[in-house]
Amino acid sequence: MLIIENDQDIRHVIEFILQEHGLDTLSTPEPENLSEIIPFAPDVILLDEFINSRPGHRLCKQIKHVAGLKHVPVIILSTANDIELIAAECEANDHISKPFDINDIVDKVVRMINHTSIAY
């Protein structure tokens, strides 16, 4: 489970809660490049739409076109009103609106992990 969130407080809360639910997590405000993500082989990527150097939807689109990552489910987090459209355009598997209910994040992440493990 990889969390890409530029807000340190939000990132730490999400990471703590997911770890409390038994999930292995790695978090970063933003990866320098996609090759950093591949060795970690995350089950799911939770991606903030508004990271520092580029929009999250661009990073999502890049992830979905990298051989070692394209099968990894991506969940976009955003305050944008058009989050459903953004998620669809960048090929994200799901989306969560901010402010969010932490239980919604846990439920969606666990569902994605279970779905992915069944598919592979």
Residue ranges and their predicted role:
Residues 100-110:
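C-terminal output helix
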Residues 110-120:
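The C-terminal output helix
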Residues 41-47, 51:
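Active-site beta3 strand of CheY-like receiver
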Residues 58, 80-96, 107:
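Alpha4 helix (beta4-alpha4-beta5 surface) of REC/receiver domains from two-component response regulators
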